[in-house]
Amino acid sequence: MKNGAFPHDNAAVPNVERVLPLFSLKGRTAIVSGAGAGIGLAVAQAFAEAGANVAIWYNSNKQAVTSAEDIAKTYGVKCKAYQVNVTSAEAVDKAITEIIKEFNGRLDVFVANSGITWTEGAFIDGSVESARNVMSVNVDGVMWCAKSAGAHFRRQKEEGTTIDGKPLDNFIAGSFIATASMSGSIVNVPQLQAVYNSSKAAVIHFCKSLAVEWTGFARVNTVSPGYIITEISNFVPPETKTLWKDKIVMGREGRVGELKGAYLYLASDASSYTTGLDMIVDGGYSLP
């Protein structure tokens, strides 16, 4: 932006007329953090099915290693698991650079999906350590991933080359997607989770701001799931889930597979004119 105006015609247009090819990720490289299970693993599977080579990051769930092998075998792409601490800017930057070198010299998509919940009830009764941990993983983790991924997106657009100096084919713009939450826009009941809610609100606004900063070389969007059946919510008692369903227009929790389309859309050229979007996928919970 200069003098309050964005550069005209700064975003390239895909040279594709038919709709299905727009969703292809063939030959591209994607990194998905928090992909040991749940939403992140489903997203990695979707990207691989669409033709992408995928690096999946995990924190402690070593099942990710086997999952990566299964993805590679099933979809005929390169897929490998990496243990990365997203709260460390240095670890994130090192991992991203090494993955780009190890894969095909490029980065096309980054999904910042790592996140943890708040389980200590009212904020004033919870521990300072837990609050800091939620913010460190949910907010700092997204920022450090964005900082490193964005630098690679910008270099690729400016230089038109892979990391080892070869011509970069079919790179229109990078796509950075962060997993936020409907909790970033509403206040959940009956559970009390002010820290978690505010962490996701921060992610949404951070990504909207990056969408402005990164115009010309990358698109930035968020996906805000509602109540989705994953391991992260196994601790929730059945009576609480019943109260959730009372407030969901569709009357049930979502499945991780029902989020695949949202992430694939935002990762692919199908969303070439979409940036700064917070896509809420919550079965209608936020409507009433």
From Swiss-Prot:
Does the keyword Acyltransferase feature in the UniProt annotation? Answer: no
The UniProt induction remark is: Transcription is repressed by D-glucose and induced by L-arabinose and L-arabitol.
Q: Which Pfam families match?
A: adh_short_C2
- InterPro entries assigned to the protein according to its UniProt record, in alphabetical order: NAD(P)-bd_dom_sf (IPR036291), Sc_DH/Rdtase_CS (IPR020904), SDR_fam (IPR002347)
| Single GO BP term | L-arabinose catabolic process to xylulose 5-phosphate
* Entry binding sites for NADP(+): I39, N113, K147, Y196, K200, I228, T230
Q: Which GO terms describe its molecular function?
A: L-xylulose reductase (NADPH) activity; oxidoreductase activity, acting on NAD(P)H, oxygen as acceptor
Q: Which pathway, per its entry?
A: Carbohydrate degradation; L-arabinose degradation via L-arabinitol; D-xylulose 5-phosphate from L-arabinose (fungal route): step 3/5
Q: What is its EC number?
A: 1.1.1.10
Q: Which PROSITE patterns match?
A: ADH_SHORT
Record's keyword annotation contains NADP: yes
The record's note on what follows loss of this gene reads: Decreases strongly levels of growth on solid medium and biomass accumulation during liquid cultivation for both L-arabinose and L-arabitol; and impairs L-xylulose reductase activity.
Alphabetical UniProt keywords: Arabinose catabolism, Carbohydrate metabolism, NADP, Oxidoreductase
Q: Which reaction does it catalyse?
A: xylitol + NADP(+) = L-xylulose + NADPH + H(+)
Q: Where is the active site?
A: S181, Y196, K200
What family is this? Belongs to the short-chain dehydrogenases/reductases (SDR) family.
Q: What does this protein do?
A: L-xylulose reductase involved in the catabolism of L-arabinose through an oxidoreductive pathway. Catalyzes the NADPH-dependent reduction of L-xylulose. Is also able to convert D-xylulose, D-ribulose, L-sorbose, and D-fructose to their corresponding polyols.
Please give the name of this protein: L-xylulose reductase
What species does this protein belong to?
Answer: Hypocrea jecorina (strain QM6a) (Trichoderma reesei)
Q: Which gene encodes it?
A: lxr3
